[in-house]
From Swiss-Prot:
GO cellular component: acetolactate synthase complex
pH dependence of this protein's activity: Optimum pH is 6.
Protein name, UniProt field: Acetolactate synthase, catabolic
Gene Ontology MF, one: flavin adenine dinucleotide binding
Enzyme class, broadest EC rank: transferase
Pfam families: TPP_enzyme_C (PF02775), TPP_enzyme_M (PF00205), TPP_enzyme_N (PF02776)
Matches recorded under NCBIfam families: acolac_catab, PRK08617.1
EC number(s) per entry: 2.2.1.6
Length: 559
């Protein structure tokens, strides 16, 4: 490989940066140019890499994160100095919390100007260090390839996340001597030690009420395949965080207690409280706080690529650290009988199944207008088939969807819980579509979150992205409102005015739809799904039942 990339003289450091990106297999770069980084944009014109101009830097990071989550290879954002970098912060923090590999390259003032009060001077490394896995400035031109290569390694290995590289203007504009480094990828790990796997197999054999708790890393495709074999072998009940959506397939659906998160009141939560053995697979505490679900009465097993980050409510008794898929496959081989459910666990799963069937039969009969959230979820279930990718923003709708809409393909759903960032869904959808243009992407937001990234409709139209965006309209920040009402019995700062979302979408060149009656919901969604290109559907929603989400909600109370 060294002979393939000899040391050579580059007219500009930017040329070496771009060649290093090509060596990493980068297919597109999301960003906004500026004077401190425009030489890199110029060099990209002579490369195989596609430039995707965006309308806000945070959205560049969101789009790159979608590429990273779906492919496992870091997506790339490219921004200028000063506010170009500071605008990027939310996207990078979100990617880091959600485990999405992203590499961001940010322009910076010339090295000689770092200590001066000059235009757009900012200590971006200090700014990004707390919210990334890796943040560094290139201080010597001949280190360019090494720094960029290591940024990819940091972003992609272990639990993936974000990495930031600061590129001073004189480093990328000036000549440099160096060579491109071949992409080495993340190092291949082996399974956890055999004796530790044997120990967990014995714990499973002795347990009366074991349960698997799945986290984001369990939904990586190879891990998901191994998990499904383990579920079939063991017949152990399973629950998951929101981020692990799609890890459990339809064959194991009868043992799936649904997703858990935010409020401790789901079937999965009841099984966790009942459990004498909890096996966490690919889980990070940022996905669902251990204090919410860990009773302290169960033996706790941690299976992941990294040791557990311990806290008072998460101190595993056994840790299986290594390649997750390899570990799960070995564990499955060590299990010699299927679990017989305890009467209590069997009843919890039967009740969960009853509620699923109730929603399937009666969800479409909720005829009030504005629409009940379950009516919308039931209609969405019909359009989000296995070929559709779903991206979900943050808001009250996110809880209804996470609890009651089911998907069975690993990484089919992108949902945020680490930072609970508003505005992610539309840029995520654009990034996801670029990875798989043959797949329709459906994104969902509230009317609050939508306007935080709605300018990217122009990007979607320019790219002719086959993206359908659904807006649940209630003229307020409802998820905050229901919590304020519970805590203070009054509302503050959560109401805003209406707008014509159909006209707004059409002003960008997208196809706009507005649901104007309950009976129009399903026909409108079908018509919007038939659009070959960007489309937006505004759906008025009645959130009066949202306080029930924080209690022991049983669907028979509504349906």
């Amino acid at each position: 490989m060294d002979k393939q990339y000899p040391v050579r003289q580059w007219a500009h450091g930017a040329d070496l940066v771009v060649s290093q990106l090509e060596a990493q297999g980068v297919r597109q770069v999301f960003g906004i140019p500026g004077a401190k980084i425009d030489k890199v944009f110029d060099s990209l014109l002579d490369s195989s890499i596609r430039i995707i101009p965006v309308r806000h830097e945070a959205n560049a990071a969101f789009m790159a994160a979608a590429v990273g989550r779906i492919t496992g290879k870091a997506g790339v954002a490219l921004v200028t100095s000063g506010p170009g970098c500071s605008n990027l912060i939310t996207g990078m923090a979100t990617a880091n919390s959600e485990g999405d590999p992203v590499v961001a390259l940010g322009g910076a003032v010339k090295r000689a100007d770092k200590a001066k009060q000059v235009h757009q001077s900012m200590d971006t490394v200090a700014m990004f260090s707390p919210v990334t896995k890796y943040a560094i400035e290139v201080t010597a031109p001949d280190a360019l390839a090494e720094v960029v290569s290591n940024a990819f390694r940091a972003a992609e290995q272990g639990r993936p996340g974000s990495a930031f590289v600061s590129l001073p203007q004189d480093v990328v504009d000036g000549p440099v001597s160096g060579k491109v480094l071949p992409a080495s990828g993340a190092p291949q790990m082996g399974a956890a030690p055999d004796d530790a796997i044997d120990q967990v197999a014995k714990l499973i054999a002795q347990a009366k009420n074991p349960i698997f708790l799945l986290g984001l890393m369990a939904s990586q495709p190879e891990n998901s395949k191994a998990l499904r074999r383990l579920l079939e072998t063991s017949h152990i009940p399973v629950t998951s965080t929101y981020q692990a959506a799609g890890a459990v397939n339809q064959d194991n659906f009868s043992r799936f207690a649904g997703r858990v998160g935010l409020f401790n009141n789901q079937a999965g939560d009841r099984l966790l409280q009942l459990a004498d053995l909890v096996i966490c697979i690919g889980y990070s505490p940022v996905e669902y706080e251990p204090a919410m679900w860990n009773s302290g009465n169960a033996t706790l097993v941690h299976i992941d690529v990294l040791p557990a980050y311990e806290e008072r409510n998460y101190t595993p008794d056994v840790e299986l650290v290594g390649d997750i898929a390899g570990t799960l496959n070995k564990l499955a081989q060590n299990i010699d009988h299927r679990l017989v459910l305890s009467p209590q666990a069997a009843e919890i799963l039967r009740d969960r199944q009853h509620q699923r069937e109730l929603l399937d039969r009666r969800g479409a009969q909720l005829n009030q207008f504005a629409l009940h959230p379950l009516r919308i979820v039931r209609a969405m279930q019909d359009i989000v088939n296995s070929d559709v990718t779903l991206t979900v923003d943050m808001g009250s709708f996110h809880i209804w969807i996470a609890r009651y809409l089911y998907t069975f393909r690993a990484r089919q759903v992108m949902i945020s819980n680490g930072q609970q960032t508003m505005g992610v869904a539309l840029p995520w959808a654009i990034g996801a579509w670029l990875v798989n243009p043959e797949r329709k992407v459906v994104s969902v937001s509230g009317d609050g979150g939508f306007l935080q990234s709605s300018m990217e409709l122009e990007t979607a139209v320019r790219l002719k992205a086959n993206v359908l965006h659904l807006i649940w309209v209630d003229n307020g920040y409802n998820m905050v409102a229901i919590q304020e009402e519970k805590k203070y019995q009054r509302l503050s700062g959560v109401e805003f005015g209406p707008m014509d979302f159909k006209a707004y979408a059409e002003s960008f060149g997208a196809k706009g739809f507005a649901v104007e009656s309950a009976e129009a919901l399903e026909p409108t969604l079908r018509a919007a799904m038939d659009v070959d290109g960007p489309a937006v559907v505004a759906i008025p929603v009645d959130y009066r039942d949202n306080p029930l989400l924080m209690g022991q909600l049983h669907l028979s109370q509504i349906l």
